Every structure is written in C-alpha cells, then in structure tokens.
Amino acid sequence: MDSVEIIIRAKQKDLNGKVEIVEHKAQGSYGCKGGKHYIRYMDKHLSPKEQVPTVIKLGDRELTIIRQGLVSSRQSFILQGETRADYHTPYGTMELVMHTHELSSEFQESQGSIHLVYSLEAN
C-alpha cells in the first residue's frame, strides 16, 4: 500500500435546509486489490478520546466504510440502493439507513477522488 494524504470534504444539509461544510485531512494508505480500491486512515474527528481506525473499500457500484474502535460501524453504500447499518458509540447504538443517490470515482497514478451523495436516517 502507498502512503497518501486523504482529504475528506463533506457537505451536510439538515431537515431545515441548513448547510454545513466540513473538511478533514489525514495521512493514510491506498492500495488496489482484486479490482477494489482500499483507503486506510486513522479518523481523529469521530471521538475526542481516541483516533478510530477507518477503511474505505470501493468497488464498481458499492462503497463500504468500516470503523473499528471507540466508534464502530460497517456502512455500505450501493448506487441507487438503500442499506442499513448499526453505528456503535460509547453512548449507545444507532440504526442508520442510507439511501445512495450518486457514487462515482476516478483514480489516476498519483491521485484519486470519490464522489458520494446519500441521505441518512438515524433511529
């Protein structure tokens, strides 16, 4: 796996239409195996107590985010599909429902990008 700088830009819109734009940077690693792209990094923005190991696995029409640590979950996003996941935190577990509207990616020799648009319900 190659060392990479990871930049995550997120635009979040709540039910009232309020938009918040967030950007996080991390050092991580990238590799491709069996036609799937893997990005690994330590997420320091999910918990004030510890960094959370995070893996992004990208296939043709599916993206999976796997977190294992103080916060743990396995969220899958399937293009034009609905998926469910349990999101475990020290404060309890939430059931998440993701509706994936757009999923695309572009990888070149020295850089890549993933574009994901989804709506989220938390129960």
Please provide the spans of the model-predicted regions:
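N-terminal intrinsically disordered, cationic/polar leader segments
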Residues: 1-122
